[in-house]
Amino acid sequence: MCCGPCGPCCGPCCGPCCGPCGPCGGGCGPCYGPNVCGPCYACGPCGGCYCGYPCC
């Protein structure tokens, strides 16, 4: 699993990019906007980019 108990990332560079349930760590890709996230990020419920949430 890319992100442990919280599900996979959006993108190919999982592993060190993601915390188990919190916001993604840096180094894999940016958040480009509320609903447009870079590799290894997903859109969270409040418009930020988080690990383990589905895209909006």
Curated annotation (Swiss-Prot):
One of its GO terms (cellular component) is sperm flagellum. One of its GO terms (biological process) is spermatogenesis. Changing residue 31 to W: In strain: ZBMEL131. Keywords: Developmental protein, Differentiation, Repeat, Spermatogenesis. Testis. It comes from the Eukaryota. GO terms for molecular function: structural molecule activity. InterPro entries: Mst87F. This protein is mostly composed of repetitive C-G-P motifs. Belongs to the MST(3)CGP family. This is Male-specific sperm protein Mst87F. It comes from Drosophila melanogaster. The lineage of its organism: Eukaryota, Metazoa, Ecdysozoa, Arthropoda, Hexapoda.
